Swiss-Prot record:
This is Endogenous retrovirus group K member 104 Pro protein. Gene3D superfamilies: Acid Proteases. The keyword Hydrolase applies. It catalyses: Processing at the authentic HIV-1 PR recognition site and release of the mature p17 matrix and the p24 capsid protein, as a result of the cleavage of the -SQNY-|-PIVQ- cleavage site.
Amino acid sequence: WASQVSENRPVCKAIIQGKQFEGLVDTEADVSIIALNQWPKNWPKQKAVTGLVGIGTASEVYQSTEILHCLGPDNQESTVQPMITSIPLNLWGQDLLQQWGAEITMPAPLYSPTSQKIMTKMGYIPGKGLGKNEDGIKVPVEAKINQKREGIGYPF
């Protein structure tokens, strides 16, 4: 799973105890939180001993009474004992993100700064495809070495 930073927030799916949930990747959250309206009624929960900080004031805060089996977005095995409260969407916190091996990377630019300036002046928009409708390739074509020494430039 990968997500480019954009105006859209990074969400991914996880399967907890066989049920699929979609949640926001939240590197600031220590624990994962499931929205109360998505928590299955037959799954046990208890009033949380500690409150939640950073999501405003939540009057009802619960925690799963059990440690639950979870599959991450790329089927990474993990366990979670999530908090449950009235929030608009689920949050995947560091308790799961660490088990999934999540990392934030900033790849090196594919092109030199000079070539990026030239392309921008020509109308290229980063992240969009090349071409009139911006639907062309988004990454450079990878050169392949001709090991057989056949074809253009080599005698037959």
